[in-house]
Regions:
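Active-site-proximal beta-strand/loop segments in catalytic clefts of secreted hydrolases
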Residues: 25, 57-59, 82
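Hydrophobic beta-strand anchors of alpha/beta hydrolase catalytic cores
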Residues: 22-23, 54, 102
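Conserved beta-strand segments of alpha/beta enzyme cores
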Residues: 2, 53, 76-78
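Conserved strand-loop elements at the edges of beta-sheets that form or border functional pockets
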Residues: 5-8, 59, 98
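Hydrophobic heptad-repeat coiled-coil signature
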Residues: 30-33
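Short, internal strand/loop/helix patches
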Residues: 67-103, 107-108
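Proteins that catalyze or organize thiol-disulfide redox chemistry
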Residues: 1-23, 28, 38-41, 45, ...
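Structural microenvironment flanking redox-active thiols in thiol-disulfide oxidoreductases
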Residues: 35-73, 86-91
Length: 125
């Protein structure tokens, strides 16, 4: 697991030029988000060699809870947080008002799918 301090610049540096990136907004206190994490683990392992990345953006306030959830869920992909909760500029940029929320981005950072989950997400690979 790698964690990155969240700014709009670090976000863009992280997703641009990659292959397909799933940007997943979540929080340690969000039960459905935590279930999604477990489902992402298999998908990530299966497709990361082909350029698929997951960037999890937390809307947590507490770093300890955030990092503990990452470890417990076995979420080995990249994680970002600014620990401002719903005041996160990135959550505002993507108009995220409920969790879980996810966006599939192409290598130019364009949204190609929104809130794709489970079997529908696996079918895209």
């Amino acid at each position: 697991m790698s964690t990155i301090d969240l700014t709009l610049d670090t976000f863009e540096d992280t997703v641009l030029g990659e292959g397909i990136t799933l940007v997943d907004f979540w929080a340690s206190w969000c039960g459905p988000c935590r279930l999604e994490n477990r489902g992402y683990a298999e998908l990530y392992e299966r497709h990361r060699a082909a350029g698929f990345e997951i960037l999890a953006v937390s809307v947590d306030h507490d770093a300890r809870s955030w990092k503990a959830a990452i470890a417990k869920d076995g979420a080995t992909w990249r994680h970002m947080a600014d620990l401002t909760g719903w005041k996160s500029p990135l959550a505002a940029r993507y108009s995220v008002t409920a969790l879980p929320a996810s966006f599939l981005l192409d290598r130019e950072g364009r949204i190609v799918a929104k809130d794709v989950r489970g079997k529908a997400l696996a079918a895209l690979g």
